[in-house]
Amino acid sequence: MHIRSFISKSWANSWPMTLIMFFEFLIGMTDIYIAGRVGKEVQATYGFVVQFYFIFIIIANALSMGTVSVVSRLFTAGDKAALAKTVWSVIITTATVGAVFSVAGIFATHWFMEFINIPVGLKQYGTQLGKIYACGLVFHYLLVSTNGILRSCKMIRSSLLTMAIVCLMNIGLNFIIVFHTRLGFWGIALSTVISVFAGSIVNLWHCRAFMNKARAFSFSVVRNVISIGWPGGATQAMWQVHSMVMFLILSSLPEKSIEILAALAAGIRIESAIFLPAIAFNMANAVIVGNLIGEGKKKDAYRGGLVTMFMGTGIVLLLTVIVIASARWIAPLLSNNETVVAETIRYLYISMLSEPFMALWVILGGGLSGAGDTRSIMFNVIAGIWLVRIPLSYICVVLLGLSAASVWWTMNLSQLIMAVFMTRRYWQRKWLM
């Protein structure tokens, strides 16, 4: 394939995913904006509860990762019977697991909030938000899974339409419920539940095109999907748990711990303007590489992954410059507390320096995922997060008593290390064998 063909194929998959991630960004920004207007306690609690919530989403993301790898290859190989069996099996499995975790989340939230070491003033807010979010887990599971199916089968624009609906509903309901009903801050979580329910129904309707009347369920298909997806799930689990550990480490700061936590929540939401496009190119790369491998074009799969990485990293670099230039204007929009605003700006100025490295390893990781090489991604995260970021952050804050800025610099170092390891793995091409 000519380089222009790679660029065209990459962009055809990447721009809808970028818009989808932009919708996710708008939802997150709206959540943190509304939480900040309610109060710094709610804003800090929201930042923690969302990390807790997405720990439960990990299984869905793992299944989706395995689904994309399997379905993208089956779709281009032209095996309609195997494709139909895979789609049906994945949907049934996802719905079942999602329902189990919804129930578990509802009953476990109160216990977890009592057990975890966070400021006492945040526990009540966390319990209420957590239980509401748990109610929507089963629908979120279906939404994630069916989005993966649609983009694997070259119906990414249908997925884009669904997420546009989810975005509009989530944002609109957020403002209405929080500010115009007695439910108050509950609306932050309730708007998510309602919108993902609607999105899952729309996507299930689209997925009918890939299912036959037999509705055959296959345990072997599920095992195959899980075997590819579980390292991805483990990777996301380690990432989410690491976020909670970082939250606890920062809670140990002797001064301004709540303000720092609120600033981190706000900073991450602003940073997601950069991170989510990288994830969009990651997901697009998984489909591109998977489709090309399904066609038997391994050399093209390798080159297509590189082209997608360079495109995505270039966009991330541009967005990084924009965020740095506008940080002092954006941060006050998310909080009316002067200390939170100042710490948010400090976080952005430091963390932005490593964004191109983040984009590089995340997007190349998408290509590896599409080929089914999810274990190397897992080992990369273990090295960067659990052997570098967490230990050094603990040493800086707990043992040495340094400020939060030391943690931000430690995060930059870990991004660089992960970029080096992922580039080396991709360049070796062992994942194509």
Task: Describe each region flagged by the PLM.
Residues 64, 132-151, 159-170, 188-203, ...:
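Short runs within selected transmembrane alpha-helices of multi-pass transporters and secretion channels
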Residues 40-51, 126, 130, 189, ...:
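Small-residue hotspots at the loop-to-helix junctions and early N-terminal turns
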Residues 12-31, 132, 143, 166, ...:
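Transmembrane helical elements of multi-pass membrane transporters/channels
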Residues 26-44, 113-120, 176-182, 240-268, ...:
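Helix-terminus/linker motif at the lipid-water interface of multi-pass membrane proteins
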Residues 29-33, 103, 111, 145-149, ...:
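Alpha-helical transmembrane segments of multipass membrane proteins
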Residues 2-33, 37-38, 54-66, 70, ...:
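N-terminal transmembrane alpha-helices
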Residues 1-17, 71-136, 169, 179-230, ...:
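Short alpha-helical transmembrane segments in multi-pass integral membrane proteins
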Residues 43-103, 140-158, 261-327, 359-380:
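Small-residue-rich hydrophobic transmembrane alpha-helices
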